[in-house]
From Swiss-Prot:
Domain of life: Bacteria
Reactions listed under catalytic activity: 5-O-(1-carboxyvinyl)-3-phosphoshikimate = chorismate + phosphate
Named cofactor requirement(s): FMNH2
Name this polypeptide is given: Chorismate synthase
Protein backbone atom coordinates (compact mmCIF):
# COMPACT_ATOMS: atom_id res chain seq x y z
CA UNK A 1 0.00 0.00 0.00
CA UNK A 2 1.29 3.44 -0.87
CA UNK A 3 0.12 7.00 -1.38
CA UNK A 4 1.19 10.27 -2.97
CA UNK A 5 0.10 13.79 -2.09
CA UNK A 6 -0.07 16.90 -4.27
CA UNK A 7 -1.03 20.52 -3.77
CA UNK A 8 0.19 23.87 -2.51
CA UNK A 9 -0.71 25.63 0.72
CA UNK A 10 -2.65 28.42 -1.02
CA UNK A 11 -3.54 26.56 -4.21
CA UNK A 12 -7.01 25.24 -5.09
CA UNK A 13 -6.65 22.26 -2.76
CA UNK A 14 -4.78 19.13 -1.77
CA UNK A 15 -4.99 15.69 -3.34
CA UNK A 16 -3.94 12.20 -2.28
CA UNK A 17 -4.20 8.89 -4.09
CA UNK A 18 -3.96 5.63 -2.14
CA UNK A 19 -3.15 2.37 -3.87
CA UNK A 20 -3.31 -1.10 -2.34
CA UNK A 21 -6.35 -1.03 -0.07
CA UNK A 22 -8.22 -4.35 0.10
CA UNK A 23 -11.66 -4.59 -1.47
CA UNK A 24 -14.71 -4.65 0.77
CA UNK A 25 -13.48 -2.50 3.65
CA UNK A 26 -16.18 -0.23 5.12
CA UNK A 27 -15.28 3.42 4.58
CA UNK A 28 -17.24 6.69 4.68
CA UNK A 29 -16.20 10.30 4.16
CA UNK A 30 -17.04 10.89 7.83
CA UNK A 31 -14.25 8.49 8.84
CA UNK A 32 -11.83 10.93 7.22
CA UNK A 33 -13.56 14.19 8.14
CA UNK A 34 -13.49 13.52 11.87
CA UNK A 35 -9.69 13.17 11.69
CA UNK A 36 -9.35 16.34 9.61
CA UNK A 37 -11.33 18.21 12.24
CA UNK A 38 -9.05 16.91 15.00
CA UNK A 39 -5.99 18.16 13.10
CA UNK A 40 -7.40 21.69 12.96
CA UNK A 41 -7.88 21.97 16.71
CA UNK A 42 -5.56 22.76 19.59
CA UNK A 43 -4.54 25.84 21.56
CA UNK A 44 -2.01 27.91 19.62
CA UNK A 45 -3.35 27.51 16.09
CA UNK A 46 -3.26 30.55 13.81
CA UNK A 47 -5.92 32.58 12.01
CA UNK A 48 -6.05 30.26 9.01
CA UNK A 49 -7.87 27.61 11.03
CA UNK A 50 -10.79 30.05 11.23
CA UNK A 51 -10.89 30.05 7.42
CA UNK A 52 -10.31 26.40 6.57
CA UNK A 53 -13.03 23.92 7.55
CA UNK A 54 -11.57 20.85 5.95
CA UNK A 55 -13.94 18.36 4.34
CA UNK A 56 -12.82 15.52 2.10
CA UNK A 57 -14.22 14.76 -1.34
CA UNK A 58 -13.70 11.10 -2.16
CA UNK A 59 -13.67 10.90 -5.94
CA UNK A 60 -12.62 7.31 -6.68
CA UNK A 61 -12.17 3.84 -5.23
CA UNK A 62 -15.28 3.59 -3.03
CA UNK A 63 -18.82 2.53 -3.92
CA UNK A 64 -21.78 2.29 -1.55
CA UNK A 65 -19.57 2.70 1.51
CA UNK A 66 -16.98 0.04 0.71
CA UNK A 67 -13.58 0.05 -0.97
CA UNK A 68 -13.30 -1.49 -4.43
CA UNK A 69 -9.66 -2.55 -4.31
CA UNK A 70 -8.94 0.21 -6.84
CA UNK A 71 -6.99 3.39 -6.02
CA UNK A 72 -8.82 5.72 -3.63
CA UNK A 73 -8.59 9.41 -4.60
CA UNK A 74 -9.34 12.22 -2.15
CA UNK A 75 -9.43 16.01 -2.49
CA UNK A 76 -9.55 18.67 0.23
CA UNK A 77 -10.40 22.19 -0.92
CA UNK A 78 -8.42 25.20 0.31
CA UNK A 79 -11.09 27.73 1.28
CA UNK A 80 -8.42 30.45 1.33
CA UNK A 81 -7.76 29.89 -2.39
CA UNK A 82 -10.20 32.67 -3.33
CA UNK A 83 -7.79 35.21 -1.81
CA UNK A 84 -4.81 33.79 -3.70
CA UNK A 85 -6.21 33.01 -7.17
CA UNK A 86 -3.94 35.51 -8.93
CA UNK A 87 -0.82 34.92 -6.84
CA UNK A 88 -1.14 31.13 -7.19
CA UNK A 89 -2.68 31.05 -10.67
CA UNK A 90 -1.98 27.95 -12.74
CA UNK A 91 -2.03 30.07 -15.92
CA UNK A 92 0.48 32.87 -16.65
CA UNK A 93 -0.41 36.31 -15.22
CA UNK A 94 0.77 39.87 -16.03
CA UNK A 95 4.28 40.63 -14.73
CA UNK A 96 3.03 43.11 -12.11
CA UNK A 97 0.81 40.39 -10.65
CA UNK A 98 3.54 37.76 -10.96
CA UNK A 99 5.68 39.74 -8.51
CA UNK A 100 2.84 40.07 -6.02
CA UNK A 101 3.66 38.36 -2.73
CA UNK A 102 7.10 37.34 -4.04
CA UNK A 103 9.39 36.00 -1.31
CA UNK A 104 13.07 36.92 -1.56
CA UNK A 105 13.99 36.87 2.13
CA UNK A 106 14.20 33.24 3.33
CA UNK A 107 13.16 32.27 6.85
CA UNK A 108 15.83 30.62 9.03
CA UNK A 109 14.89 27.03 9.80
CA UNK A 110 12.52 26.70 6.84
CA UNK A 111 12.98 25.07 3.42
CA UNK A 112 12.93 28.47 1.67
CA UNK A 113 16.60 29.10 0.87
CA UNK A 114 17.85 25.58 0.24
CA UNK A 115 14.73 24.73 -1.76
CA UNK A 116 15.28 27.81 -3.91
CA UNK A 117 18.90 26.80 -4.50
CA UNK A 118 17.96 23.22 -5.33
CA UNK A 119 15.20 23.98 -7.85
CA UNK A 120 16.36 27.37 -9.12
CA UNK A 121 13.36 29.31 -7.79
CA UNK A 122 14.09 33.03 -7.42
CA UNK A 123 10.66 33.38 -5.80
CA UNK A 124 10.78 31.23 -2.71
CA UNK A 125 7.00 31.15 -2.55
CA UNK A 126 7.42 28.25 -4.98
CA UNK A 127 9.18 26.40 -2.16
CA UNK A 128 7.20 27.41 0.90
CA UNK A 129 3.84 26.67 -0.71
CA UNK A 130 4.70 22.97 -1.00
CA UNK A 131 6.91 22.61 2.08
CA UNK A 132 4.15 24.09 4.26
CA UNK A 133 2.59 21.87 6.93
CA UNK A 134 -0.72 22.42 5.15
CA UNK A 135 0.29 19.28 3.20
CA UNK A 136 -0.24 17.22 6.36
CA UNK A 137 -3.99 17.67 5.79
CA UNK A 138 -3.99 14.90 3.22
CA UNK A 139 -1.46 12.84 5.16
CA UNK A 140 -4.03 12.84 7.95
CA UNK A 141 -6.69 11.86 5.39
CA UNK A 142 -4.57 8.89 4.29
CA UNK A 143 -3.87 8.04 7.92
CA UNK A 144 -7.59 8.14 8.68
CA UNK A 145 -8.13 5.33 6.19
CA UNK A 146 -5.26 3.38 7.73
CA UNK A 147 -6.80 3.88 11.18
CA UNK A 148 -10.14 2.62 9.88
CA UNK A 149 -8.49 -0.52 8.51
CA UNK A 150 -6.67 -1.15 11.79
CA UNK A 151 -9.81 -0.51 13.85
CA UNK A 152 -11.68 -3.17 11.89
CA UNK A 153 -8.84 -5.58 12.79
CA UNK A 154 -8.91 -4.76 16.51
CA UNK A 155 -5.91 -2.41 16.44
CA UNK A 156 -6.35 1.07 17.93
CA UNK A 157 -4.16 4.19 17.66
CA UNK A 158 -4.05 7.18 20.02
CA UNK A 159 -1.75 10.16 20.43
CA UNK A 160 -1.21 12.84 23.04
CA UNK A 161 1.12 15.71 23.90
CA UNK A 162 3.84 14.90 26.40
CA UNK A 163 5.68 18.21 26.48
CA UNK A 164 5.38 21.80 25.23
CA UNK A 165 8.00 24.49 25.71
CA UNK A 166 9.77 22.57 28.47
CA UNK A 167 6.61 21.81 30.47
CA UNK A 168 6.18 18.04 30.65
CA UNK A 169 3.14 16.01 31.64
CA UNK A 170 3.64 14.15 34.92
CA UNK A 171 2.17 10.74 34.12
CA UNK A 172 2.34 8.47 37.17
CA UNK A 173 0.76 5.46 35.47
CA UNK A 174 0.25 3.88 32.05
CA UNK A 175 -2.86 4.92 30.14
CA UNK A 176 -4.78 2.53 27.90
CA UNK A 177 -5.42 3.55 24.30
CA UNK A 178 -9.08 4.25 25.08
CA UNK A 179 -8.09 6.40 28.08
CA UNK A 180 -5.62 8.36 25.96
CA UNK A 181 -8.32 9.02 23.37
CA UNK A 182 -10.91 10.17 25.89
CA UNK A 183 -8.58 12.35 27.98
CA UNK A 184 -6.64 13.96 25.14
CA UNK A 185 -9.80 14.85 23.21
CA UNK A 186 -11.03 16.82 26.21
CA UNK A 187 -7.80 18.84 26.48
CA UNK A 188 -7.11 22.05 24.48
CA UNK A 189 -3.49 20.91 24.12
CA UNK A 190 -4.22 17.14 23.97
CA UNK A 191 -2.41 16.58 27.28
CA UNK A 192 -3.24 13.87 29.84
CA UNK A 193 -2.11 15.98 32.83
CA UNK A 194 -4.48 18.83 33.80
CA UNK A 195 -1.81 20.71 35.77
CA UNK A 196 0.71 20.60 32.93
CA UNK A 197 -2.07 21.48 30.48
CA UNK A 198 -2.58 24.89 32.08
CA UNK A 199 1.16 25.61 32.09
CA UNK A 200 1.44 24.58 28.44
CA UNK A 201 -1.40 26.91 27.44
CA UNK A 202 0.24 29.80 29.29
CA UNK A 203 3.55 29.16 27.55
CA UNK A 204 1.80 29.14 24.17
CA UNK A 205 0.07 32.44 24.99
CA UNK A 206 3.37 33.98 26.13
CA UNK A 207 5.13 32.87 22.95
CA UNK A 208 2.38 34.39 20.80
CA UNK A 209 2.54 37.65 22.73
CA UNK A 210 6.30 37.78 22.16
CA UNK A 211 6.04 37.00 18.45
CA UNK A 212 7.77 33.69 19.08
CA UNK A 213 7.01 29.97 18.70
CA UNK A 214 7.54 26.86 20.83
CA UNK A 215 7.84 23.13 20.15
CA UNK A 216 7.34 19.97 22.14
CA UNK A 217 7.08 16.19 22.26
CA UNK A 218 4.18 13.97 21.19
CA UNK A 219 3.58 10.30 21.93
CA UNK A 220 1.63 7.74 19.91
CA UNK A 221 0.44 4.42 21.34
CA UNK A 222 -0.89 1.55 19.22
CA UNK A 223 -2.77 -1.21 21.06
CA UNK A 224 -3.95 -4.63 19.91
CA UNK A 225 -0.95 -5.10 17.61
CA UNK A 226 -0.27 -8.74 16.67
CA UNK A 227 3.26 -10.05 17.16
CA UNK A 228 5.43 -10.48 14.10
CA UNK A 229 4.83 -7.34 12.01
CA UNK A 230 8.07 -6.24 10.38
CA UNK A 231 11.16 -8.44 10.09
CA UNK A 232 14.74 -8.79 11.28
CA UNK A 233 16.04 -10.38 8.05
CA UNK A 234 16.92 -7.08 6.30
CA UNK A 235 17.54 -3.61 7.70
CA UNK A 236 14.80 -2.05 5.60
CA UNK A 237 12.19 -4.56 6.76
CA UNK A 238 12.29 -3.39 10.39
CA UNK A 239 8.95 -1.80 11.27
CA UNK A 240 10.33 0.42 14.03
CA UNK A 241 12.75 1.89 11.48
CA UNK A 242 9.87 2.63 9.10
CA UNK A 243 7.88 4.29 11.88
CA UNK A 244 10.89 6.38 12.91
CA UNK A 245 11.27 7.56 9.31
CA UNK A 246 7.57 8.42 9.15
CA UNK A 247 7.72 10.43 12.39
CA UNK A 248 10.77 12.42 11.30
CA UNK A 249 9.14 13.09 7.91
CA UNK A 250 6.49 15.25 9.61
CA UNK A 251 7.14 18.98 9.16
CA UNK A 252 9.40 20.35 11.95
CA UNK A 253 10.00 16.95 13.59
CA UNK A 254 13.65 16.30 14.47
CA UNK A 255 13.77 12.94 16.25
CA UNK A 256 11.97 9.78 17.38
CA UNK A 257 12.31 7.25 20.20
CA UNK A 258 10.55 4.06 21.30
CA UNK A 259 9.66 2.89 24.81
CA UNK A 260 12.15 4.32 27.31
CA UNK A 261 14.00 5.70 24.28
CA UNK A 262 17.27 7.49 24.93
CA UNK A 263 16.98 6.72 28.64
CA UNK A 264 18.09 3.19 27.69
CA UNK A 265 21.60 4.59 27.27
CA UNK A 266 21.70 5.51 30.96
CA UNK A 267 20.45 2.20 32.37
CA UNK A 268 21.89 -1.32 32.69
CA UNK A 269 20.41 -4.03 30.49
CA UNK A 270 18.68 -5.64 33.46
CA UNK A 271 16.52 -2.51 33.79
CA UNK A 272 15.77 -2.16 30.08
CA UNK A 273 14.92 -5.61 28.70
CA UNK A 274 11.31 -6.73 29.09
CA UNK A 275 10.90 -10.08 30.85
CA UNK A 276 8.76 -12.63 28.99
CA UNK A 277 5.59 -14.04 30.55
CA UNK A 278 3.03 -16.59 29.35
CA UNK A 279 -0.53 -17.40 30.34
CA UNK A 280 -3.24 -19.55 28.80
CA UNK A 281 -5.53 -16.55 28.46
CA UNK A 282 -3.09 -14.06 26.92
CA UNK A 283 -0.28 -16.17 25.48
CA UNK A 284 3.11 -14.41 25.49
CA UNK A 285 3.36 -10.97 27.10
CA UNK A 286 6.08 -8.83 28.72
CA UNK A 287 6.34 -7.74 32.34
CA UNK A 288 7.26 -4.23 31.19
CA UNK A 289 7.27 -2.38 27.86
CA UNK A 290 10.58 -0.55 27.97
CA UNK A 291 11.30 -1.38 24.33
CA UNK A 292 8.05 0.16 23.12
CA UNK A 293 6.57 -2.98 21.58
CA UNK A 294 9.54 -3.93 19.38
CA UNK A 295 12.24 -6.59 19.44
CA UNK A 296 14.49 -7.11 16.43
CA UNK A 297 12.49 -4.65 14.34
CA UNK A 298 9.33 -6.73 14.85
CA UNK A 299 6.24 -6.10 16.95
CA UNK A 300 6.20 -8.36 20.02
CA UNK A 301 2.50 -8.05 20.83
CA UNK A 302 2.88 -5.28 23.39
CA UNK A 303 1.59 -1.78 22.59
CA UNK A 304 3.75 0.26 20.24
CA UNK A 305 4.95 3.37 22.08
CA UNK A 306 6.75 5.99 19.99
CA UNK A 307 7.54 9.64 20.64
CA UNK A 308 8.52 12.44 18.28
CA UNK A 309 10.13 15.79 19.04
CA UNK A 310 8.93 18.88 17.18
CA UNK A 311 11.05 22.00 16.91
CA UNK A 312 9.41 25.44 17.19
CA UNK A 313 7.75 26.56 13.95
CA UNK A 314 10.28 28.58 11.87
CA UNK A 315 7.87 31.39 10.93
CA UNK A 316 8.28 34.09 13.58
CA UNK A 317 6.25 37.29 13.91
CA UNK A 318 9.43 38.76 15.42
CA UNK A 319 11.60 37.56 12.52
CA UNK A 320 15.28 36.66 12.72
CA UNK A 321 18.05 38.00 10.52
CA UNK A 322 18.20 36.78 6.95
CA UNK A 323 19.63 37.85 3.60
CA UNK A 324 17.73 39.12 0.58
CA UNK A 325 18.64 36.83 -2.33
CA UNK A 326 18.43 39.74 -4.82
CA UNK A 327 20.56 42.39 -3.10
CA UNK A 328 22.46 40.09 -0.69
CA UNK A 329 21.77 42.73 1.98
CA UNK A 330 20.85 41.82 5.54
CA UNK A 331 17.14 42.05 6.33
CA UNK A 332 14.64 40.52 8.68
CA UNK A 333 13.18 37.29 7.29
CA UNK A 334 9.80 37.22 5.57
CA UNK A 335 6.71 36.71 7.72
CA UNK A 336 3.98 34.30 6.66
CA UNK A 337 0.75 33.62 8.55
CA UNK A 338 1.49 30.83 11.01
CA UNK A 339 0.79 29.20 14.37
CA UNK A 340 2.62 29.97 17.62
CA UNK A 341 2.49 26.27 18.53
CA UNK A 342 1.26 23.35 16.46
CA UNK A 343 2.30 20.52 18.79
CA UNK A 344 -1.30 19.48 19.66
CA UNK A 345 -2.20 19.28 15.96
CA UNK A 346 1.08 17.50 15.25
CA UNK A 347 0.06 14.71 17.62
CA UNK A 348 -2.85 13.98 15.25
CA UNK A 349 -0.47 13.95 12.28
CA UNK A 350 1.84 11.61 14.20
CA UNK A 351 -1.09 9.24 14.82
CA UNK A 352 -1.78 9.26 11.09
CA UNK A 353 1.74 8.43 9.93
CA UNK A 354 2.21 5.71 12.56
CA UNK A 355 -1.16 4.17 11.68
CA UNK A 356 -0.16 4.19 8.03
CA UNK A 357 3.09 2.29 8.62
CA UNK A 358 1.36 -0.30 10.83
CA UNK A 359 -1.39 -0.78 8.23
CA UNK A 360 1.19 -1.25 5.48
CA UNK A 361 2.96 -3.86 7.62
CA UNK A 362 -0.33 -5.69 8.17
CA UNK A 363 -1.04 -5.81 4.44
CA UNK A 364 2.51 -6.96 3.68
CA UNK A 365 2.18 -9.88 6.07
CA UNK A 366 -1.38 -10.95 5.27
CA UNK A 367 -3.45 -11.30 2.11
CA UNK A 368 -4.51 -7.78 1.17
CA UNK A 369 -6.83 -8.32 -1.80
CA UNK A 370 -10.07 -8.94 0.11
CA UNK A 371 -10.94 -7.43 3.45
CA UNK A 372 -12.90 -10.45 4.67
CA UNK A 373 -9.95 -12.80 4.11
CA UNK A 374 -7.60 -10.24 5.67
CA UNK A 375 -9.62 -10.24 8.89
CA UNK A 376 -9.67 -14.04 8.92
CA UNK A 377 -5.90 -14.32 8.42
CA UNK A 378 -5.12 -11.78 11.15
CA UNK A 379 -7.29 -13.69 13.63
CA UNK A 380 -5.69 -17.00 12.67
CA UNK A 381 -2.25 -15.46 13.19
CA UNK A 382 -3.20 -14.18 16.64
CA UNK A 383 -4.23 -17.72 17.65
CA UNK A 384 -1.06 -19.27 16.23
CA UNK A 385 1.27 -16.90 18.07
CA UNK A 386 -0.67 -17.43 21.29
CA UNK A 387 -0.23 -21.21 21.03
CA UNK A 388 3.44 -21.14 19.94
Amino acid sequence: MRYLTAGESHGPGLTTIIEGLPAGMPLLAEDVNKELKRRQGGHGRGARMRIEKDQVQITAGIRHGKTLGAPVAMFVENKDWKHWETVMSIEPVPEKNEKSRRVSRPRPGHADLVGGMKYGHNDMRNVLERSSARETTVRVAAGAIAKKLLHELGIEVAGHVLEIGGTRANLTRDFSVSEIKETSEASPVRCLDEVAEKEMMQKIDDAKKNGDTIGGIVEVVVGGVPAGLGSYVQWDKKLDAKIARAIVSINAFKGAEFGVGFEAARKPGSEVMDEILWSKEDGYTRRTNNLGGFEGGMTNGMPIVVRGVMKPIPTLYKPLQSVDIDSKETFNASVERSDSCAVPAASVVAEAVVAWEVAVAVLEKFDGDRFDTLKKHVEEHRNLTKEF
